[in-house]
């Protein structure tokens, strides 16, 4: 049994913006609720169900795959809420894996870079091209089947536990 958590919302808002206006705390809270608390909520509920499974190979009962982002490591200007929540997802990966190990449940996280999604497809080239240029190789957006292949690898490799894997073509986001 596998649970793949893919929650993600963001906001483009600086800590202190124009006219020295502070970041809207309601917006920050909404991003935390969805990206971080929502991810933990689904993980804890899925783990409770998985704990009832009959153990399979290696006595495994399940796998939870959470989705972070390269923003967890390379948050850009205006991404404080998003980067904080995705950093939180990375930060809870190992403790969740340790908590669930006695139950035979693994937990890993994928930190994708810039992927070819409907949201990114709607972005103008002037937004997409600089992001593609920051990618080392291959110089393109990631494709959803590549994310799915990483999930499949995590399913098949039962020795992989408590890890966050960047799936990003080597991108290192610049501050802007």
List each model region and its residues.
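Active-site helix of classical SDR
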Residues: 43, 85, 93
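C-terminal substrate-recognition "lid" of short-chain dehydrogenase/reductases
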Residues: 143-167, 172
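Catalytic Tyr-X3-Lys loop
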Residues: 1, 9, 21-41, 65, ...
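Residue(s) in the substrate-gating loop at a strand-loop-helix junction
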Residues: 69
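Catalytic Tyr-x(3-8)-Lys segment
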Residues: 31-33, 126-146
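Conserved mid-core segment of classical short-chain dehydrogenase/reductases
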Residues: 10-29, 48, 52-58, 78-81, ...
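Short, small/polar-rich loop/turn modules that mediate ligand/substrate recognition or access, typified
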Residues: 101, 106, 161-163
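Alpha-helical segment proximal to the catalytic Tyr-Lys
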Residues: 48, 98-99
């Amino acid at each position: 049994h596998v649970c793949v958590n893919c929650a993600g919302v963001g906001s483009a808002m600086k800590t202190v913006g124009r006219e020295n206006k502070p970041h809207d705390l309601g917006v920050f809270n909404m991003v935390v609720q969805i990206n971080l608390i929502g991810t933990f909520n689904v993980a804890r509920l899925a783990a409770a169900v998985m704990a009832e499974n009959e153990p399979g190979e290696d006595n495994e009962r399940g796998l939870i795959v959470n989705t972070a982002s390269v923003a967890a490591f390379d948050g850009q200007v205006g991404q404080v809420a998003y980067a904080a929540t995705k950093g939180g997802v990375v930060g809870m990966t190992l403790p969740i894996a340790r908590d669930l190990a006695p139950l035979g449940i693994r937990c890993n996280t994928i930190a994708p870079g810039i992927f070819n999604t409907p949201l990114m497809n709607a972005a103008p080239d002037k937004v997409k091209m600089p992001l593609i240029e920051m990618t080392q190789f291959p110089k393109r957006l990631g494709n959803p089947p590549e994310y799915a292949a990483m999930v499949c690898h995590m399913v098949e490799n039962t020795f992989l536990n408590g890890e966050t894997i960047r799936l990003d073509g080597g991108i290192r986001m610049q501050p802007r």
